[in-house]
Amino acid sequence: VKICDLTQFYSPRSGGVKRYLQEKIAYIRNYSPDDKHVLIVPGPRTDVTTNGVSRVYSIHAPVVSRRSQYRALLNLRAVEEILGQERPDLIESSDPYQVGWKAVAAGRALKVPVVGFYHSHFPEAYLRGRTKFLGERGAERAMKWTRAYVRRLYNRFQATLVASDKLAGVLSEWGVHNVRSTRLGVDTGIFKPAPDDTEGTRDRLGIKDEEKLLLYVGRLAKEKNTLTLCRSFELLHRRHPNEFRLVVVGDGPQRNELRKLQRNSCRSSIKWIAYCECAVELASLYRAADLFVHPGVQETFGLAALESQACGTPVVGIGGSYMDSVICHNQESWAQENSPEALATAIEEYSAKKLSVLGRNASRVARSLYSWPKVFEELFCIYRELRANYRRF
């Protein structure tokens, strides 16, 4: 089977979609060598490279964000030409905008099934919180229009993949009739409790034995709720001046809020790492942390939270999001409202628990349920089923 992945959510500076695609290529190489893979993404120049089982097409596209290096894939004619040349057996689109529509049209022209992966719940991510600008009635109309858009696009796919049972239920309620629940995974060869390099990592970061190390990994952006993270840590620092340290790995439009916090009251208590390219180094940071803080309330899955648990570090956050199902330990002390005060209190309560025991148990569950080979074995069964049942005429 030749599978083509098509997305504009692809940055050289990592990201969940990029991680998923890299792991898919690794799975084909190691476990399904008879299959072939094509990847079409935006880039600084038009180019094609071969990476073992995968051929990667980069199409010149303008930069949307210089920091994250995300680009808008606007040259849809080039996409069409590549698909016509490669003639894949199945197309998967990770994009809810113009690239998604192009994938649907190309699938019909080539008479092959097209799958949509609903990686981001963009209606909530971008419309919630706009009420003060649109007014309640305007926001309600915008959400109604967005739901209709989601129905119109995703019902054109042969299947809509969603990595959250709860979100799959939401899309079904909205009228998307082809929803299939799936999962994302974790590289259990890298994200694991061993080796015990905690002492060396904490020394390198300047963290004392008696200090509680909090870790956040992800974009600094409104949809990730990082402003709540910053304000909750400011509260913690005021309440317990020498007890907590925060390491932030990631960059994004809300970086200035973090810098402001560093400049003002929390200068020596926050370390910011804009980008961590090495997965082994990232795993060391997860293992060194006492708690992983996940402030997001609109996540569809939560890869970083899963990686942290696989390394033996429990997660604290705000309850009720679509990623609750990937938390492999109890959430009884999680914040029950989206506020800095509630998140700060949840961190305080969790810090009093036996975190090493929680972490060990969570690691065992995460590594057994969410290994990438297991995830892709299930996903490729869906691919083959869709191909077998696809009506070409």
Spans of model-derived segments:
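Conserved donor-binding/catalytic core segment of Leloir-type glycosyltransferases
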Residues: 208-234
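Nucleotide-activated donor-binding/catalytic signature segment of Leloir-type glycosyltransferases, i.e.
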Residues: 256-276, 280
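Aromatic "clamp/platform" in nucleotide-sugar-dependent glycosyltransferases that forms part
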Residues: 297
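Short hydrophobic beta-strand element within catalytic cores of glycosyltransferases
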Residues: 314-317
